Amino acid sequence: MEAIARKLTLKFGFIQSSYWISQCAINSFAAVYLHAKNFDNTQIGFILSFAAILSLILQPLTASFADKSKRVTLRHLLLALMFLVFGLSLLLYILPGSFLLISVIYILVNAVEFTVNPLFNSLAMEYMNQGVPMNYGLARGMGSISFAVMSFFLGSLVDKFGADIILPVFLVCYVLVILSTYLFHDKLPVKSQEQKDVRGLSDNIVLEEEKEASGILTFFLDHKLFLLMLCGVAMIFYSHVLINTYLINIMEHVGGSGSDMGVSLSIAAFLELPAMAFFIYIVKKIKVSTLIKLSALFFAIKSFAILLAPNVYMVHFSMVFQMIAFALFTPASIYFVNDLIEKENRVKGQSMLGVANIGVAGTLANLTGGKLLDSYGVTAMLLTGTVVTAVGFLIICISIKEPDKQKNTGGLT
């Protein structure tokens, strides 16, 4: 089982690496690409907001389908969504660009990209819940390192060749995303009854795990504190999305350029690796609920630090807090949801995390961020983000309690 775990960790690391370099191109450099196509900040905000709104619809639908479907595997569902993204992106590259065409395709591509991210997490958890000791944090950290390298080089490429290089880079990266997802599967050894009993995988539990998945409304009625937690998650990610989307504007505000933006993104992503890679050991010492609260606090600290940054170097320094904010929150929240939510609704639970931190936060941050930038400037935008994130931290502290892992079986922490 250890050999299978190592193999699947590497394969999942390949998925995370390829996905996050593609995200770097299509999402983190979205403002750069769209500015070059003569979109203003408000229009960019609307495009990314509509993408997030569409993902709000797609994520629950795909999650419910994945929870209930007996014939279509989660991996095949992901591959279908990815071919859609690749086809749309190829159209955008081939066809002559117009305001309407770029807007519609960019919205669709980003909406589906946002949707597949939580499904990847569910894909990994399927194996972990069967007793495969994959190192999720290490695999996710590989994604961060890849994002860091891509941010640095893409920033340099844009300075040298212009923003038109972004789309071809994305297409090449996305071929790797499709390939890595196709390769992510492995046959597990058949367990003896004694091994099943040791792991708590008795026949009674298997029968219990085959219960019908809940509808969205019933799910939230059964998990009211989780719904409150999601509100807090959306609020702490509000500033995170603002900073990522409009980092080029923040850099220009303090005298920086596209290359500086790439360096800043690289610093943040490189520093994510230690926390993610060692999360499997950290979570044995500190409760996952405590880690989420700590990470939420550092989202607010990072936003406040960038608000006060007088120059490019201090913006770079502010990215150090990413190591305790985003880097801890990502694996901690996924482990938390896996322990909190019953098996038949786990894909839905992971997807709701995506709805909160990508869909809701992305919608509100991009919608208001562009308007705040055009009307009041960078400082007002960052101040708003810091206040919203601080409130989100308080909500998370109120709403999170350590889950009962025995109740839902298959806990990982």
Segments the model singles out, each with a brief description of its role:
Residues 46-64, 266-278:
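Central cavity-lining transmembrane alpha-helices of secondary-active solute carriers
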Residues 2-52, 225-233, 237-264:
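Helix-loop boundary and gating motifs at the non-cytosolic
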Residues 166-183, 381-399:
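Symmetry-related core transmembrane helices of the 12-TM Major Facilitator Superfamily/SLC fold
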Residues 109-142:
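Cytoplasmic helix-loop-helix junction between adjacent transmembrane helices
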Residues 75-90, 290-305, 386:
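Structural signature of the two symmetry-related core transmembrane helices
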Residues 58-72, 158-159, 275-287, 373-374:
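Helix-to-loop junctions at the C-terminal end of transmembrane segments
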Residues 1-6, 185-230:
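Juxtamembrane intracellular "pre-TM" segments in multi-pass secondary transporters
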Residues 17, 99-116, 123, 234, ...:
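Hydrophobic core of transmembrane alpha-helices in multi-pass small-molecule transporters
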